[in-house]
């Protein structure tokens, strides 16, 4: 007992568990659950097929008992339970499990209803014809062989398959910490994809999908939607929805409808499916079914679902799709062993690995065949030498007391070449000379020296080979060998020829075993890009002060003459008014900047479309805004271009410039666009090119204009720098990035405004007080905003009462900076203008002329006022 105790070594249980479990996990991953990307087989499948091949259980020979094969597999290669091996054989023989069966079974191998196969002592099997293509050239040293579990047998590490079996038959398995689930595909399509890859190794996933549109299941059915396929082929993971093929038939006399199911999804148990439908009918979870029966037979599947007279067959069928396995999801997870390591692979990765495997197999096969051809040519040379020297050789053999001495005598002396010289000359450059042949053998000094192998071949020569006809056959065979050797050397020396051989073999496989696609792939509404269904049109987007947002077509608003009463743009709640207004395209992205400096994304078409009088929807229901957070600026963006900046201005006069690409990745929770100080908020956002100028307009009628490059580009979370020096309670109301020669239109809260040429605003330094933009008087009120306009533009103005006026810019006077302007919109008492927006596409003049409108009396002739001393002083201050 003490001796035993001395053999016990204490170990840390954590380390032992970690080490042992890791060993177990890797054993399961590599040796059991995952297929090799090259041949698409797990170890148990590979061992079964190899055992059948060794047994000579070929497709064109008699069947053998399954028990015989199972015994060989578990006895030689797979030391596990017989049931696991037999289950593997059964699955490879089921037409509803494998797209291309690898085992040809005779007997009861189960059914799609879940019936078990008969015992292995009753069933018989042999290799399917296509299975031989997985093991073709196995005897030509094309793959490495490894020891079996006890070292008494050898088994191939991988099959030299000519078929891309991983994609063709798929695979599924659960390992430790990972799993694989690869759907089967159509052989013709997969090989076409491989050929396309051979032609262009830079082919894209989309290019491969032109040849391989999606999985092809043995049970056919319908794949509903392409998006999951595209995702799986691109990333290695995805989900597809498989729907049963069913049709609704109506009785011509009674009008009653019947649902006929001809195909069900892959891996669905038909009997359980029917039981589930019956259960749903019994529990009244599905209404409208009067009878259910299975009429499937040897000619095909047929599930009959009779619909009640008052029910609609399509409605019943849709309910069955949603509540039963008439529609299922298939999660694609393309994990396979690549160089012995588990790896998730996309479609191109799998095809690339298979083509590389074929390149290695064909190369090794060519080397093997070249060696064998040279060895045979070496023997033929000896036989030709024997025929050329027949008399002395026969005399030598007759005199030799033993075969060993005869062999030694043949090797010890040179022999005349005779007519063999021409034959050897045809070979040229020692192309047929074996690599192992020493220099002293073969042709030397005009004579031929035999090797031991050649001497033995001469001794084994039958007398009938001495006839003239046999001599001609020998020469013809040698000539054919020389041609074969030349071709083999060409394959080894030319990558193009090597790939051509691979292509030819794939085409032969396709032509021999290829068939039509079974599974139909249909478009799903989820696959259709919603933008493709939405027409592009210009719309008016409005955001009220209390956060109601909507859009409506721009054509809903008719142009009115200056001073018109306008039309209501929105029915607003009491004490609410339109706070933001812009014109955008339905396909644009709206960048929504909040009062807290955060940015949210929305497509214009995602906004609620509402009529002119409707309020819209609260934007808090569309965006994940926090408490007391509101949207203060919105900006339409078509594309996120390099070199374009987002320029932001706050009410306190702070400005910030950030690259537009910083905002190109939408996040559902939003991101920080600018850090704001307490009490500050965004008032304007625009896009700049890096060489633009910036204009900031304040409520007190001041404006500062400076170069954009005076503000460096900053990150998203930066606060910014001062753009304008404000006095007292003044605040910035508008940001303009002037472009072209358009004028600046300034509007005040009492409905007055004016146009002033942009070049009248001098360029100053950043962070100064600026110059006067418009006279702020009791009549005008403070400045509401400013926009840049052209003569052909129209503008839209909106009041806090919800009144909107659309006016042609050409009707507004162009005056100097230091003026009060003219009336643009008549407002009621206690009604103020709160926003304006330029409209770049005016309607026809005929429409404008047809609209009634009034012009404010005397306003049109208001002349520019002389600058006061205070104004001059303000300008001189800069």
UniProtKB/Swiss-Prot annotation:
A single GO cellular-component term on record:
cytoplasm
Q: Which CDD domains match?
A: TOP4c (cd00187)
A GO MF label = DNA binding
First-tier enzyme category under EC: isomerase
Which keywords does UniProt give here? ATP-binding, Cytoplasm, DNA-binding, Isomerase, Nucleotide-binding, Topoisomerase
Name where it mostly resides: cytoplasm
Locate the active site.
122
Q: Spell out the subcellular localization from the entry.
A: Cytoplasm
Q: Residue ranges of region Disordered?
A: 844-878
Which EC number(s) are documented for this chain?
5.6.2.2
Q: How does it assemble?
A: Heterotetramer, composed of two GyrA and two GyrB chains. In the heterotetramer, GyrA contains the active site tyrosine that forms a transient covalent intermediate with DNA, while GyrB binds cofactors and catalyzes ATP hydrolysis.
Tell me its family. Belongs to the type II topoisomerase GyrA/ParC subunit family.
Provide the protein name: DNA gyrase subunit A
- The scientific name of the source species is Salmonella typhimurium (strain LT2 / SGSC1412 / ATCC 700720)
Question: Which taxonomic lineage does the organism of this UniProt entry have?
Answer: Bacteria, Pseudomonadati, Pseudomonadota, Gammaproteobacteria, Enterobacterales
């Amino acid at each position: 007992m003490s001796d035993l105790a001395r053999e016990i070594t204490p170990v840390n249980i954590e380390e032992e568990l970690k080490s042992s479990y890791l060993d177990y996990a890797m054993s399961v991953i590599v040796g059991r659950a995952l297929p090799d990307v090259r041949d698409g087989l797990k170890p148990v499948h590979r061992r079964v097929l190899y055992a059948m091949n060794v047994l000579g259980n070929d497709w064109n020979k008699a069947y053998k008992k399954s028990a015989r094969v199972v015994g060989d597999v578990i006895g030689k290669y797979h030391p596990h339970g017989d049931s696991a091996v037999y289950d593997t054989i059964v699955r490879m023989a089921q037409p509803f499990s494998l797209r291309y069966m690898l085992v040809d079974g005779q007997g009861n191998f189960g059914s799609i209803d879940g019936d078990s196969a008969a015992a292995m002592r009753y069933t018989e099997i042999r290799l399917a014809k296509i299975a031989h293509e997985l093991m073709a050239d196995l005897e030509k040293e094309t793959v490495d062989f490894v020891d079996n579990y006890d070292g008494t047998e050898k088994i191939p590490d991988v099959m030299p398959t000519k078929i891309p079996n991983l994609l063709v038959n798929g695979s599924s398995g659960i390992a430790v910490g990972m799993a694989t689930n690869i759907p089967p595909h159509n052989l013709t399509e997969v090989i076409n994809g491989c050929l396309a890859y051979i032609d262009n190794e830079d082919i894209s996933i989309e290019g491969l999908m032109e040849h391989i549109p999606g999985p092809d299941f043995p049970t056919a059915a319908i794949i509903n939607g392409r998006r999951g396929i595209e995702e799986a082929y691109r990333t290695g993971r995805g989900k597809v929805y498989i729907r049963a093929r069913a049709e609704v038939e109506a009785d011509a006399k009674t009008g009653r409808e019947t649902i006929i199911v001809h195909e069900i999804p892959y891996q669905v148990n038909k009997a359980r499916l029917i039981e589930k439908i019956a259960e749903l009918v019994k529990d009244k979870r599905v209404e409208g079914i009067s009878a259910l029966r299975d009429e499937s037979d040897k000619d095909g599947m047929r599930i009959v679902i009779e619909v009640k007279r008052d029910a609609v067959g399509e409605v019943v069928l849709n309910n069955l799709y949603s509540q039963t396995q008439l529609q299922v999801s298939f999660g694609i997870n393309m994990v396979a062993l690549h160089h012995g390591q588990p790896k998730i692979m996309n479609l191109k990765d799998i095809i690339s690995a298979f083509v590389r495997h074929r390149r290695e197999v064909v190369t090794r096969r060519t080397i093997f065949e070249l060696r064998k051809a040279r060895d045979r040519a070496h023997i033929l040379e000896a036989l030709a030498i024997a025929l050329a020297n027949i008399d002395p050789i026969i005399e030598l053999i007759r005199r030799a007391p033993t075969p060993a001495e005869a062999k030694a005598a043949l090797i010890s002396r040179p022999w005349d070449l005779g007519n063999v010289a021409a034959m050897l000359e045809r070979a040229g450059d020692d192309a047929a000379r074996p690599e192992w042949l020493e220099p002293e053998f073969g042709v030397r000094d005009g004579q031929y020296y035999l090797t031991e192998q050649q001497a033995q071949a001469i001794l084994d020569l039958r007398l009938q080979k001495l006839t003239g006809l046999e001599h001609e056959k020998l020469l013809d065979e040698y000539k054919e060998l020389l041609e074969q050797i030349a071709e083999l050397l060409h394959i080894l020396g030319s990558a193009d020829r090597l790939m051509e051989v691979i292509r030819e073999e794939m085409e032969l496989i396709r032509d021999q075993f290829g068939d039509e696609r079974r599974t139909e792939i249909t478009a799903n509404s989820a696959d259709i890009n919603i933008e493709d269904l939405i027409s592009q049109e210009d719309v008016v987007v409005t955001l009220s002060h209390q956060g109601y947002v909507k859009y409506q077509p721009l054509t809903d608003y008719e142009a009115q003459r200056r001073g018109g009463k306008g039309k209501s743009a929105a029915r607003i709640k009491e004490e609410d008014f339109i706070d933001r207004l812009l014109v955008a395209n339905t396909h644009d992205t709206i960048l929504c900047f909040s009062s807290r400096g955060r940015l949210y994304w929305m497509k214009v078409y995602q906004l609620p479309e509402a009529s002119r009088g409707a309020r819209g929807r609260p934007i808090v229901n569309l965006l994940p805004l926090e408490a007391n957070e509101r949207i203060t600026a919105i900006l339409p963006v078509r594309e996120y271009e390099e070199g374009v900046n987002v320029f932001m201005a706050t009410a306190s006069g702070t400005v910030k410039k950030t690259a537009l690409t910083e905002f190109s990745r939408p996040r559902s929770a939003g991101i920080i666009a600018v850090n704001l100080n307490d009490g500050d908020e965004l008032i304007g956002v625009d896009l700049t090119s890096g060489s633009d100028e910036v204009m900031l307009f304040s409520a007190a009628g001041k404006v500062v204009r400076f170069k954009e490059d005076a503000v460096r580009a900053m990150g998203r979370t930066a606060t910014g720098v001062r753009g304008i020096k404000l006095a007292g309670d003044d605040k910035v109301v508008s940001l303009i990035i002037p472009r072209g020669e358009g004028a600046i239109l300034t509007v005040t809260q009492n409905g007055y405004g004016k146009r002033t040429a942009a070049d009248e605003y001098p360029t100053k330094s950043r962070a100064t007080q600026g110059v006067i933009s418009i006279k702020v008087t009791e009549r005008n009120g403070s400045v509401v905003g400013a926009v840049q306009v052209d003569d052909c533009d129209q503008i839209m103005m909106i009041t806090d009462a919800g009144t909107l006026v659309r006016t042609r810019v050409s009707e507004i006077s162009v005056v100097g900076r230091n003026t009060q302007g003219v009336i643009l919109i008549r407002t009621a008492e206690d009604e103020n203008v709160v926003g304006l927006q330029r409209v770049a596409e005016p309607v026809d003049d005929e429409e404008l002329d047809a609209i009634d409108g009034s012009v404010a009396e005397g306003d049109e002739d208001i002349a520019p006022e002389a600058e006061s001393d205070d104004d001059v002083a303000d300008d001189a201050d800069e």
